[in-house]
Amino acid sequence: HSIRRRQRQMCIRDRPNTYQVSNGIKNIPMKGNLKSDYGLPNESIVLSCFNQSFKIDKIIFESWMNILKNLSSAYLWILEDNEVAKENLTECAKLHGISSDRLIFAPRIDRDRHLERLTLVDVALDTRIYNGHTTTTDALQSSVPVVTIMGKHFASRVSSSLLSLIGLDELIAHNTQEYEEKIIKLCSEKTYLKKIKEKLSNDVCMKKLYDIKEFTYEFELCLKGILKN
């Protein structure tokens, strides 16, 4: 048993930056669509969560409801995962005093059309226990800020690792209060939101998110370190 334990320990290495590798979005479709094309008021603040519904837990949903209470012109755009989840989320919103028409459900569509609609989002809201992975990357590469809560286990730290990689630690919260405050600040301060979006549009900054050569080099170093031991 001690030999096996040592072997397992030898295979554990900290990956610098993030575990996730992406080849990036080459060309994000830009067709000048309006929010109203997707059932959203054109003058609204659009908050989105396109993560699968099983990632939404009671605590994070309550935070979303608190945010909607603080932002009267905000709407929550959620992936329409299945009918049961849709009904449950709608009922939960009502229990928190939020009108069901402020939850807009987005059907699954092909990737190009999804990236096209993603550009209409003001701020993306990450889930807590199980973060977005590709969902977070898609948002960031579409110049949409993602606010996350950094947890203590792997699946709850993915988005924070991606944000840290591109120098946006300011979007990482450590509890629900911070999470709500950061989202409300982004939505309330247009100059601040614009600054964050401009940073996400910076190719030099974003290149780190999909630098496959650098990722491969760092991964090879990890493997060499394992072999040495």
Give the ranges of each region predicted by the language model:
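Single conserved hydrophobic/aromatic residue that forms the stacking wall/gate
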Residues: 1-8, 12
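Hydrophobic/aromatic beta-strand patches that form the interior of the parallel beta-sheet core
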Residues: 13-16, 106, 123-125, 147
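Conserved catalytic-core segment of nucleotide-activated headgroup transferases in glycan assembly
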Residues: 18-110, 117-119
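Short acidic loop-to-helix transition motifs that present clustered carboxylates
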Residues: 109-112, 132
